[in-house]
Swiss-Prot record:
One of its GO terms (molecular function) is glycine N-acyltransferase activity. Pfam families: Gly_acyl_tr_C (PF08444), Gly_acyl_tr_N (PF06021). It is an enzyme of class 2 (transferase). It is found in: Mitochondrion. The modification N6-acetyllysine is found at residues 41, 43, 48, 80, 83, 183, 256. InterPro entries: Acyl_CoA_acyltransferase, Glycine_N-acyltransferase, Glycine_N-acyltransferase_C, Glycine_N-acyltransferase_N. Its main location: mitochondrion. The keyword Hydrolase does not apply. This is Glycine N-acyltransferase-like protein. SUPFAM superfamilies: Acyl-CoA N-acyltransferases (Nat). Keywords: Acetylation, Acyltransferase, Mitochondrion, Transferase.
Length: 296
């Protein structure tokens, strides 16, 4: 195991991961932001260097003091050879299997290795598998070969429908809005998730629409992997196209900073899939995967 400490190594890792997109997307996005100042204080581990087989990005040990905090204890994994990464992923210094944790990857073929390891270490696993999208400008830059339909090449053509700009004002979230975001997040609902959301709001760009009362009615955030996440709309304002307006605004804000932009949605969420089609988000040939692991 090797911890890539130098900025030169991390830049090399980012360049290398780019060659394996879109399967490396979750790790590529994380390493990209590590090279933008590493605000989440993450570290990148590889099995060998420079010709690595598997890379794991995780928090530093001192950040992982709460064994029950799955939102902090999160690992992003990419492997060129998922069938031969068991030994590396089983190393205690790579993944602390004694904690409640999350593993995220754009590779569904890591499932067998993760399930085998979890069984051997007496860990219960819940897997979430979703549709992965890349925004058109990012896809044009990073994976132009996936843009078979020319409509994706015109970023302006995938606009949301107009909203009442007298009623709704575009703004950014404040850390005091974390409880509201957490209330409507499917992975939220507790103190730890709320703390994670607050951290994301403090560090990364966010977007929201303020309603007539001056409070957020629709919003979207960015997490430490560079993904648009935790988007939501309060029930009274749903079915008005607000979320598509917010996702579009958040995408533009991230595009302007030169960030790669991507997101995911559940396979059963036809409303968001329709929105993604309208905004010309590019569906990836690989999935968004998360494994929630809890020691038995």
């Amino acid at each position: 195991m090797l911890h890539l400490r130098s900025s030169q190594m991390l830049q090399m890792l980012e360049s290398s991961l780019r060659k394996y997109l879109p399967e490396s997307l979750k790790v590529y996005g994380t390493v990209f932001h590590m090279n933008q100042g590493n605000p989440f204080k993450l570290k990148a581990l590889v099995d060998k260097w420079p010709d690595f087989n598997t890379v794991v990005v995780r928090p530093r040990e001192q950040e992982m003091g709460d064994d029950l905090d799955q939102h902090t204890n999160t690992y992003q994994i990419y492997s060129k050879d998922p069938k031969h990464c068991l030994e590396f992923l089983g190393t205690p210094d790579v993944i602390n299997w004694k904690q409640h944790l999350q593993i995220q990857s754009s590779q569904s073929n890591l499932n067998e290795a993760i399930m085998d390891l979890a069984a051997g270490k007496m860990v219960k696993v819940k897997r979430t598998q979703c549709i992965l999208y890349m925004m058109p400008e990012t896809a044009k830059k990073l994976v132009p070969s996936l843009l078979e339909d020319k409509e994706y090449l015109d970023h302006q053509s995938g606009r949301p429908r107009a909203i009442d700009q007298e009623m709704f004002k575009l703004s950014t979230l404040d850390v005091t809005h974390a409880p509201l975001v957490d209330k409507f997040w499917q992975f939220g609902g507790n103190e730890r998730s709320q703390r994670f959301i607050g951290r994301c709001i403090q560090i990364f760009p966010s977007s929201c629409l303020l309603g007539p009362e001056g409070t957020p009615v629709s919003w979207a955030l960015m997490d430490q992997t560079g993904e648009i996440r935790m988007a939501g709309t309060v029930p009274d304002y749903r079915a008005q196209g607000l979320i598509s307006h917010i996702i579009y605004a958040q995408t533009l804000a991230m595009d302007k900073r030169g960030y790669p932009v991507y997101n995911h949605t559940e396979q059963t969420n036809k409303v968001i899939q329709k929105m993604s089609h309208t905004l010309h988000h590019v569906p990836m040939p690989c999935d968004w995967n998360q494994w929630y692991c809890a020691p038995l």
